[in-house]
Every structure is written in structure tokens, then in C-alpha cells.
Amino acid sequence: MLIFTAPGQGAQSPGFLSPWLELPDLAEQVGAWSELAGRDLIALGTTGSAAEITDTSVAQPLLVAAALAVAGLLGEPDAAAGHSVGELAAGAIAGVLSPSDAIRLTRIRGEAMAEATAAEPTGMAAVLGGDQAAVLAAIAAAGLAAANINGAGQIVAGGTLTKLEAFAASPPAGARVRPLRVAGAFHTPHMAPAVEALAAAATGTVVKDPAITLLSNADGAVVTSGRYWGERIVAQVAAPVRWDLCMETMSDIGVTALIELAPGGTLTGLAKRALPGVELLALKTPDQLDAARELIAAHAASTNGYAAVPVGVPAEWRIVVAPGGGTFRSGGKEGEAGAVAAGATVRAGAVLGHVVQRGGERPVTASHDAVLTEWLVEDGDPVGEGQPLVRLEPEEQA
């Protein structure tokens, strides 16, 4: 199973787009998106200075345009995920919204977030190392917010520059603090005004349910509703990015290869530690396109509806996820016996349980003949859309 990931702000560097624009039709496509972005993305991605492309209103559409342009050169992945603004690129790759709408919303997002940063000098800093619980407690005690939790040993704090400086001067035990090249405290309450602006802009945007598995920064869940994804993408501006949970879900759903779209490097660096055994490729130049296509050919599988189950490729186990939020009820129809026991054989289409919602119940079904190896929730547990519920192992491997 292969996933495309799209990096977030901070991944850009001067001139990173130059080699890509030498490819046929790519400059024309980026030029068209420049009109939607209200900025000359070609000039900014080739000759823009570090200071120019650090500007939030510039960096965000530039990164989304780059990710979408490069994704268009490759085949369709099985799954997609984006870090921060990269979520908009991932949404377009998954077919939730058009690339043009992704660029349009990114422009509004970037401009609104830039405006929010002007209210008070804020920033972000990476906290490297230390005990995670102790680091999170220290961030809160310093009056800062944990804006990104990127995995073991890397948490990003956001807040006022004054508080960040004080925090860096007295870091948590075993940790070091490194300022980031960003213009404000993104994914913190400082961005609340930007949430309102993006919500207004998103109203009326045509969205569809994802055509492939799509992960959410909010909690790593697989999102199966385009409408719900839209709500999450708006709220996420002022909420933490849980990339650690996204990588946990990648492991749970059986990802075997990860391609980070240009400008690659940041997310593959995190995956090296969190996803051992997964083949990784960070796309930096067009010279790597053949390697990317080979990786896709070797690892791509289809996905099967809301269950986010890779099929067509042998796997040690597969995950069935919740089709929506609600309360999990094991068993078949109401009044029937409870959970299918671990070790039992289930047939394709068998009802394993239901998610009870206000408007009724949504069945959770087996997508293929398999052995149920482990329940990940219990009867009566509250569940969120995309939450892993049960592990299934193909019969031939049981």
C-alpha cells in the first residue's frame, strides 16, 4: 500500500521549483494556479528569496501548487496525507476538491493566517528530545501551545516570541529548542481569526467523498466524508497537527511505501524513525520520477471503501475502520448476540458491528474472507470516523 504525503510550511527553500518547471506543461499549470493564488508562483519558486517565500501568504500556495504539480506526474496512490497546509494538497489528490479550489482556499488560508500573525509577534520552535509528557507539560507551563506533535522526540511549540525565548532559555530536561522559519504561531489559538475567514471561504466549495484513503491531521483518522473533511480542514488552522497519529494510522492500515511530494525531506525524515520497514522516497528533483514510478508499481494496491483496507496485495493483517462517528455496538442487528470472537472466520460482507448515530446505525462489515484476529474497541465505546475497529487476517495467512 502506497501513500503520498505533502509537506507543510517550512519545507520550502529558495529555487526549489526551478528543476520541476523545466518539464513539459508544468510551468503552464503553475502559471494558471498563480492567478488563483494572486502571486507569481513561478517567480517565487525559482528566484524568490528566503525571506519572500517564508511569508505565510506566499509559502502556503507555493507548497500546495508544488505538491499538486508533482502528484500529477505520477500514478494514483492508495492513500494521501498532508502536514498542515499540505492537507489541502492531499484533499485534492484524494478527489475531495479540485486542484483549483485547493489553491483558492490555500490563498485565503495563507492570507488569513498572515493577518492573524500581525496582531502580535508570535512564532514556533521545535522541541527535540526529552520525555514527551514532560515536554508537553513544560510547554503548557510556559504559556505556549503544542502546535505539532510530529513523533517521538519532536514536538513544536507555538506562542508569543517573548514566551518562546524564555522557554528556549530554560528547556525541558533532556530537550533542546530550535526556532523555526515560520511567520507565526500556527495551529494555536492565535489563529482563531483565520478559522473564521477560511470557514466563510469554504462555504459553497464543491466537495466529494475521498476516492482513496485520506488521513486527517486532527487525530490521524481515516476520513471518508468530504463534508466532514471540509469541517476538519477549517478547524485545523487553530488546532494541533498530530502527525504522530497519522503515522500510527499509516502503520495500522498497512502502508508499505511512502512518497513525500516536492519539496520532500521533512516528512520522510520523521517516517524513518516511526515507520521501520516502509520504503521511503523524498521527491526533490525530476531525476527521481522514475524511482517514484517504480515504487508505485511495486507497492500500489486498491482500497476498498470506508474500510480503508488494502486489497490485491498480500498483507499480514488488515484494518476495518469506523464509517462515521458515534457509539460502537458489536454484533449484527439490534438484539442479536455480541461481538464475533477473536479467531473466528468471517466472510466478505459479514456484519461485524454497527456505529450508532443519531440518525440510525451504520454497519461495519468485513471487506473480504478473513480471520478476525483482534478487536481494537469494546462494545459501547465512543468512536470517531476512521478510527480502527478490528484487525482481519487473510485466511490463507491465518
PLM region spans:
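Non-catalytic positions within long, well-ordered alpha-helices that form the structural scaffold/packing
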Residues: E248-G254
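Acidic, low-complexity mobile loops and tails
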Residues: G305-H354, E361-P363, D369, A398
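Short, flexible loop segments at boundaries between secondary-structure elements
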Residues: E279-T303
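Alpha/beta catalytic cores of group-transfer enzymes, especially the acyltransferase/condensing modules
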Residues: Q9-A11, L36-R39, I93-A238
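FabD-like malonyl-/acyl-CoA
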Residues: M1-A134, L180, A257-P286
